[in-house]
Each structure stands twice: as C-alpha cells, then as structure tokens.
C-alpha cells in the first residue's frame, strides 16, 4: 500500500468509526469529515459586552495590576502575544503558547490540554483571572476594586440591578470574548458557494487538505478542529527547562492537577496530567486553524514559527511518538496547502482599547 493510500484509508476509517477514534468529528451526510463555514454568532447584551471590553483591557483585574487579559491576547497580534511561550503573570512565566481568543465561542474545549468544556466561557475566564501563573486575582479584591470605579458601577447597573459581584464578572468578560469572531474569511465564502473566494492554488490546497493529506480527519468543523486530544510528536521547547521560572510553573500545574510522581516529570505531558490515563501521554487538543496568518508561532509550545514549517512537520509524519503517517507531499503540494491554510484567516479585527475610568474611592460612612 502506498503512503497516499495509507493516508486515505486512515481518513476513511476515522470518518466512519467516529467516536472510537476522533470523537466529535464533524461529518457530512456521507459520513466523511468536513470543514464548515462559521455559524452565525448570536449577539449578546450590548451593555454587558461594553463593560466586558473595558475589563478585558483593565490591569486592575490582575493581582499586582501589572497585566490585563490583553497583555497575552493582544488585538494587534490576533488576540495572541506573538511569543513561543506566554509570559504569564509577572515574574512567574508560563510554559505554553498563548492561543488566539478569536472564535473561542465555537470551541469544544479550552486549554491546550483540553481540560475545560468549551461551553463554559465563564469558567475559562475565572481560571485565567485567578490562576497564580496567569493573572493571580482574588475575586473579592477584584469586586472591591471595580466597585470603587463609579463608571463601572453605572455600566454594571445597565444590565443588573445589584452591586458588582466578583463571581459574576467572569461571565461579563466572557460576553466580550464571545464577540471576537473571524470576519470575511475566504474559506467561509468558498464553503457558502462562492467559487471565486479561493485562488486556484488555494483550491489545490483544499483538495490536498480534504484528500491526499487527510488533514480533515482531525481538522474539521467550523474551526478546523475536532476538539479532541492527539499526539503529533511536537518536540519539547528547551526554554521550559532552561528557565527555572517556567519549570516551576509546569510542576505547579502538575501538582494542582493531582498528577502522580509529578516531581520527576521534565516534559509537558499534555492531557495525561488531567486524565491520568497513560494513553493520553503527550496528547494536546487539536488547535483551531482559523486566523493562522496572525498568530505565529504555532503548536502548544511555539516550536514551529511558520506555516511552511508546520506543513513540513506534518508531511514528515510529525515527531517522536506521533500518531501521524508521512504524507508524501511534493514541494508544490506543500505550497498549495500553506496557501489554503492562509485562506482560513479573515480580515484583521481592529479593536481599539477603550479609555479606562479612574478610581474614585467611596468614603466610609457616606456610601
């Protein structure tokens, strides 16, 4: 059997068996996995979204008031940060790449290790605000800080009649994040019937993506992700062990996840730290393929800096321990695939940070 036939056979098996191999795969009526256009995004409460936008850019939501959500999810960088490994909380430093927040509302799972349900945006925001290695915020302190900003109190009361509640702030920020959706991506126009939306080279790439390459077996649905965890053998980022701060943050993550024998771990074990199932060693959630033009570097640890490198990596069958099979793509086929991947990016989301209101502490006895 040729490499081409092997890949096509694996793709057919993945599509037919479904839950047994790639649970959550989006399939067409004929059973084959497919890409889909983004669904319409239901508009949220405009007043809640506006407050959420302010809070997204406000450093008062972090423990030392040194970072905001936008520090690691910068609109100018595709709501990512452009670095291989996220800086995380000041002086702590993180051990994974900061993914884009664009299209988060459509995700099946959050986090590279797939530990959070994609339907629960509020929990994602809560974890990012309160985790010691991201924003290190106490909800009670956050509640009091925001309550000392009259403009925020007024904005809050446009959609709620009670006082600002720290636990409810997570949902408010989440409502803003839900508004971050790709705009006018060529792939969406193409999938809706506009044959002119893709160039001839991109169409060739689409055929490779859905055919010879077998990419669609895992990269399907509106995001180009099955929402499952897989081992593609991405090499370790040596910076994690070279930098003691990042090493400590990794081990702290293992400890709080209840991973056995975590002090002996010196690699990022992915979903295993969550499931404790040895079969999940080195497995990470399939990333979205949306907005790749703006969100380099790639993979869970930023080890691949260009889309050409990504395609080369998959063409060779991934890295050590990978579940993948070499694709056998020619140079022109690889270029076509890269061109197609770029078509999954829409127009830049040009978001301007709002002017943030100042504190105006209330006086005791006069509230």
UniProtKB/Swiss-Prot annotation:
EC number(s) given by UniProt: 1.11.1.5
Pfam families to which the protein is assigned, alphabetical: CCP_MauG
Location relative to the cell: Periplasm
CC cofactor: heme c
EC class of the enzyme, as a word: oxidoreductase
Domain Cytochrome c span(s) in chain numbering: 47-157, 200-345
GO cellular component term of the entry, any: periplasmic space
Residues the record lists as binding heme c 2: 215, 218-219
Gene Ontology molecular function: cytochrome-c peroxidase activity; electron transfer activity; heme binding; metal ion binding
Cofactor note: Binds 2 heme c groups.
Main location: periplasm
Ligand binding (heme c 1): 69, 72-73
Alphabetically ordered keywords of this record: Heme, Iron, Metal-binding, Oxidoreductase, Periplasm, Repeat, Signal
InterPro entries noted in UniProt: Cyt_c-like_dom (IPR009056), Cyt_c-like_dom_sf (IPR036909), Cytochrome_c_Peroxidase/MauG (IPR051395), Di-haem_cyt_c_peroxidsae (IPR004852), MauG/Cytc_peroxidase (IPR026259)
Reaction(s) the record says it catalyses: 2 Fe(II)-[cytochrome c] + H2O2 + 2 H(+) = 2 Fe(III)-[cytochrome c] + 2 H2O
Endpoints of the signal sequence: 1-28
PANTHER family: BLL6722 PROTEIN (PTHR30600:SF10), CYTOCHROME C PEROXIDASE-RELATED (PTHR30600)
Function noted in UniProt: Involved in iodate respiration. May play a critical role in detoxification of inadvertent H(2)O(2) generated by the iodate reductase IdrA/IdrB.
Assembly: The iodate reductase (Idr) complex is composed of a molybdopterin-dependent iodate reductase (IdrA and IdrB subunits) and two associated peroxidases (IdrP1 and IdrP2).
The protein's name in its UniProt record: Cytochrome-c peroxidase IdrP2
Species whose genome carries this gene: Denitromonas iodatirespirans
């Amino acid at each position: 059997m040729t490499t081409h036939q092997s890949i096509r056979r694996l793709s057919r098996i993945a599509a037919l068996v479904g839950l047994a191999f790639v649970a959550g795969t989006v399939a067409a009526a004929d059973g084959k996995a497919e890409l889909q256009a983004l669904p319409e995004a239901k508009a949220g409460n405009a007043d809640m979204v506006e407050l959420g936008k302010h809070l997204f850019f406000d450093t008062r939501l972090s423990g030392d008031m040194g970072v905001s959500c936008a520090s690691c999810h910068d609109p100018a960088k595709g709501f990512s940060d452009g670095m291989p490994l996220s800086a995380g909380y000041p002086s702590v430093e993180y051990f994974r790449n900061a993914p884009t927040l664009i299209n988060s509302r459509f995700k099946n799972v959050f986090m590279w290790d797939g530990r959070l349900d994609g339907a629960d945006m509020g929990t994602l925001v809560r974890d990012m605000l309160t985790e010691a290695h991201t924003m290190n915020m106490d909800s009670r302190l956050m509640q009091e800080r925001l309550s000392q900003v009259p403009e925020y109190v007024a904005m809050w009361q446009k959609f709620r009649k009670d006082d600002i509640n720290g636990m409810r702030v997570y949902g408010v920020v989440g409502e803003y994040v839900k508004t971050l959706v790709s705009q006018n991506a060529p792939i969406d126009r193409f999938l809706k019937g506009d044959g002119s939306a893709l160039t001839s080279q991109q169409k060739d790439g689409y055929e490779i993506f859905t055919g010879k390459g077998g990419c669609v077996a895992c990269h399907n649905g509106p995001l180009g992700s099955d929402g499952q965890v897989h081992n593609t053998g991405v090499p370790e980022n040596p910076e994690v062990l070279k930098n003691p701060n990042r090493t400590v943050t990794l081990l702290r993550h293992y400890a709080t996840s209840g991973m056995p024998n975590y002090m002996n771990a010196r690699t990022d074990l992915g979903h295993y730290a969550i499931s404790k199932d040895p079969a999940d060693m080195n497995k990470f959630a399939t990333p979205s393929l949306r907005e790749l033009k703006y969100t380099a570097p790639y993979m869970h640890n930023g080890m691949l800096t260009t889309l050409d490198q990504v395609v080369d990596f998959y063409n060779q069958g991934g890295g050590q321990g990978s579940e993948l099979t070499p694709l056998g793509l020619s140079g022109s086929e690889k270029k076509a695939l890269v061109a197609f991947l770029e078509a999954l990016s829409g127009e830049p989301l040009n978001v301007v940070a709002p002017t943030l209101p100042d504190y105006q502490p209330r006086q005791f006895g006069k509230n």
